[in-house]
Amino acid sequence: YSSAASDVYKRQINERNGKRELWAQMIMLWCLQSYYEYSNDQRVIDLMTNYFKWQLSVPDEQFLEDYWENSRGGDNLLSVYWLYNRTGDQFLLELAEKIHRNTADWTRPSALPNWHNVNIAQCFREPATYYMMTGDSAMLKASYNVHNLIRRTFGQVPGGMFGADENARMGSIDPRQGVETCGLVEQMASDELMLCMTGDPLWAEHCEEVAFNSYPAAVMPDFKGLRYITCPNQTVSDSKNHHPGIDNRGPFLAMNPFSSRCCQHNHAQGWPYYAEHLILATPDNGVAAAMYAACKATVKVGDGNEISLHE
């Protein structure tokens, strides 16, 4: 909040390899959005408005240049939509086009921008996100294509995922490759967002498949323990280096937080975001029980009639 009324963004944003790194800010935007939906704190709107005005001022050649932010620009795009739906500021649509223009191209039919499992699970939805603004059906089809493409080759992992220990690699396509915990929760988030964008029950079913078959095997119920990689029928959980069978070098079967930071940051988002999408509004002022878990919800339907759902 202290940065919202000044031009200190340039000083506060990390530099990575001499370039501005916006990825960390994308994560914080989602945190602020959740906080605003809980609190209605106007400071969130003011901060995001000022921040996005600054983003619009950054030249294209300096915008979304780092690997992570370039892959994951779709997360930034969703935040721009979120703010536009609350303010209607027209400059946000210009920024949305700029973000898509400078984000990695996830519309490629076969050669993906990269084969990092978390990026694929997280970023395949970017074209569909842009479709919401443009109405270009090719964008929507591109997201379906990436989802299906990765599973045609590497989809030998039960529980909705695909084989990619860090990266999906030709020659390493059997279930033993497993998948990262990061990939699980980002796939769930993408499924939830794709469900909201399309209304296609495929995404609800797929999210449930990951949530109840893969995710519980990757973390302890109290989140005090987690795996970097979870494989079907995994019988070993040691701290040895299993490279090159596993892409990364190090103790990646039993997660060691002191040797790698991976999966420690987003592993807990799975259930909160899942819970947020259990009950959804429908275009006819109704409500849909879109995904299933024990829950209670009080919602308004029709002409504003309040009802309670208990599942």
Q: What does each of the following model-derived ranges do?
A:
Residues L32-S39, V44, Y51, Q55-V58:
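An active-site-proximal structural segment forming one wall of the substrate-binding cleft
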Residues R43, L64, W68-S71, A111, ...:
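A structural signal for alpha-helical segments
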Residues N40, L56-D60, G88, A104-R108, ...:
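Helix-capping and short linker residues that terminate individual alpha-solenoid repeat units
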Residues R11-Y38, G74-F91, L95, N117-R151, ...:
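Aromatic (Trp/Tyr) and acidic
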Residues V8, F63-Y67, S110-N114, M133, ...:
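Short coil/turn linkers that connect adjacent helices within long alpha-helical scaffolds
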Residues S6, Q55-V58, Q62, I99, ...:
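A short secondary-structure junction motif
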Residues F52, L56-P59, F63-D105, P113:
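Solenoidal tandem-repeat scaffolds enriched in leucines and small polar residues
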Residues Y1-A5, Y9:
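Single conserved hydrophobic/aromatic residue that forms the stacking wall/gate
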